[in-house]
């Protein structure tokens, strides 16, 4: 196999997005568009990948890291000019170069591989990725010769009646013989209304020199969608969402209502897990097998163990063990580690806490900056008082501890193994192992007080 290279065009301003965010960094199913493209082209066995950047170059470089080399297009003078900025990296290389736009997040490695194979089999100097659509208005038409090769690409505004009837269109993705590509770029003129250098002109140059220009027609037009505004962004989101949901269902995940379930592109979900409507799974979340998630649950960048149930709750940047029950209406905030067989009930908030196996906080509790042992019961209304207005402090609760309802644990404080805290207590000092701590005012009953009070009011 000859050397393979790729150039991703990611320098456009994205004016129609009307956004401060660089166009190719707009997310589709939680991942920036250009990252989708890079992840797919990286599966093609490339020797070099060059991303052409312009406005917001630093942000794109930060997103992609060392996966790609970069070339700067300081002034946007057209697609041919953009590719030419990669000459410093690629011009002297022998092989085949794929050119693709960074705003086509739906393209797949399979389609690009088929394009490259067609290019090789045809012995072509250039090959165009095309698609067939019933309503091709606005697209450049592919005119083929008697051998099935590309005779020319005609823009919609320049097409005659016969050419307008053609329904095979140019998608804007190409592959070229690398040396022929960079030799031809120097011949491209900007003699047009926009005064720009257009990459399709390379096709005409190669054709006029007698080279074969081939085409590969994909059956999946939606893969070629270029995102230039928020409308197209929403279309890409829907297509990608459906693709991800279908993949998960084929792999054994039950999605009750796919139209009302969102799964990020990088999430991994085990078989026999059930996702109820309103479930949103974001980032690099990993969910085990036999789980039940939702309805109306958000999980972001978290790891969920097997046979765990999460209902009407939010989990962010945390790790949950096996057979955990969360919700309804619980909030597990970042840097929390929840053990196995734990119960986190309704209206419980946990933040930056290690929660031991088989422990439970069944309702109406806040546990922050804490270390909770195993087999602990936190009664209704248990609160770790972790913040003094300036600093955060840690609460440590040992194994087998019982915290009664409506108790405040004022950190820094430790409740040792096996201790009990009486309901209604405010604990400000450490509690020894197996001790009962009572920190509340003694109850006083005043006999006949109400009658005396009412009689006094009447007099």
Swiss-Prot record:
GO molecular function (one): glucosamine-1-phosphate N-acetyltransferase activity
Linker: annotated span: 231-251
Broad class of the protein's primary localization: cytoplasm
Region (Pyrophosphorylase): 1-230
EC numbers for this chain: 2.7.7.23, 2.3.1.157
Residues binding UDP-N-acetyl-alpha-D-glucosamine, per UniProt: 9-12, 23, 73, 78-79, 140, 155, 170, 228, 333, 351, 366, 377
Gene3D superfamilies given in the database record: Hexapeptide repeat proteins, Spore Coat Polysaccharide Biosynthesis Protein SpsA, Chain A
Enzyme class: transferase
Region (N-acetyltransferase): 252-459
Entry's localization field: Cytoplasm
Positions annotated to bind Mg(2+): 103, 228
HAMAP family for this protein: GlmU
Entry-linked PANTHER family: BIFUNCTIONAL PROTEIN GLMU, NUCLEOTIDYL TRANSFERASE
Function: Catalyzes the last two sequential reactions in the de novo biosynthetic pathway for UDP-N-acetylglucosamine (UDP-GlcNAc). The C-terminal domain catalyzes the transfer of acetyl group from acetyl coenzyme A to glucosamine-1-phosphate (GlcN-1-P) to produce N-acetylglucosamine-1-phosphate (GlcNAc-1-P), which is converted into UDP-GlcNAc by the transfer of uridine 5-monophosphate (from uridine 5-triphosphate), a reaction catalyzed by the N-terminal domain.
Protein name according to UniProt: Bifunctional protein GlmU
Native source organism of the sequence: Bacillus cereus (strain ZK / E33L)
């Amino acid at each position: 196999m000859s050397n393979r290279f790729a150039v991703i065009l990611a320098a456009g301003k994205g004016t129609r997005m009307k956004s401060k965010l660089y166009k190719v960094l707009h997310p589709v199913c939680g991942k920036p568009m250009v990252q989708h493209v890079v992840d797919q082209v990286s599966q093609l066995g490339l020797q070099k990948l060059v991303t052409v950047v312009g406005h917001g170059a630093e942000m794109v470089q930060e997103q992609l890291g060392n996966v790609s080399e970069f070339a700067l297009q300081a002034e946007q003078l057209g697609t041919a000019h953009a590719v030419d900025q990669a000459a410093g990296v690629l011009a002297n290389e022998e092989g085949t170069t794929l050119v693709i736009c960074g705003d086509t997040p739906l393209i797949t490695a399979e389609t690009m591989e088929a394009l490259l194979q067609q290019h090789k089999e045809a012995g072509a100097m250039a090959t165009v990725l095309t698609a067939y659509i019933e309503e091709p208005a606005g697209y450049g038409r592919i005119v083929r010769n008697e051998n099935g090769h590309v005779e020319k690409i005609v823009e919609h505004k320049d097409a005659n009646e016969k050419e307008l009837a053609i329904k095979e269109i140019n998608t804007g993705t190409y592959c070229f013989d690398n040396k022929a590509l960079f030799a031809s770029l120097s011949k491209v003129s900007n003699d047009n209304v926009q005064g720009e250098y257009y990459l399709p002109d390379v096709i005409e140059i190669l054709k006029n020199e007698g080279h074969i220009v081939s085409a590969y027609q994909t059956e999946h037009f939606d893969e070629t969608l270029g995102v230039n505004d928020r409308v197209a962004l929403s279309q890409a989101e829907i297509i990608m969402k459906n693709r991800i949901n279908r993949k998960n269902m084929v792999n054994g995940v039950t999605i009750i209502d796919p139209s009302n379930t969102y799964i990020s592109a990088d999430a991994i979900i085990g078989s026999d897990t059930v996702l109820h409507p309103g479930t949103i799974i974001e980032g690099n979340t990993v969910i085990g097998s036999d789980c039940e998630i939702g309805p109306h649950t958000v999980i972001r960048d978290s790891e969920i163990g097997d046979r765990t149930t999460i209902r009407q709750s939010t989990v962010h940047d945390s790790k949950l063990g096996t057979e955990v029950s969360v919700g309804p209406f619980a909030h597990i905030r970042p840097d929390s580690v929840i053990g196995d067989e734990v119960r986190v009930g309704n209206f419980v908030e946990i933040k930056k806490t290690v929660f031991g196996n088989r422990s439970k906080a069944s309702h109406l509790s806040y546990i922050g900056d804490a270390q909770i042992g195993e087999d602990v019961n936190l009664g209704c209304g248990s609160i770790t008082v972790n913040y003094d207005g300036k600093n955060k402090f840690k609460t440590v609760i040992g194994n087998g501890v019982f915290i009664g309802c409506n108790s405040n644990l004022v950190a820094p404080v430790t409740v040792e193994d096996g201790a009990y805290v009486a309901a209604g207590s405010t604990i400000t000092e450490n509690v020894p192992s197996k001790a009962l701590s009572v920190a509340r005012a003694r109850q006083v009953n005043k006999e006949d007080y109400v009658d005396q009070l009412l009689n006094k009011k009447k007099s």
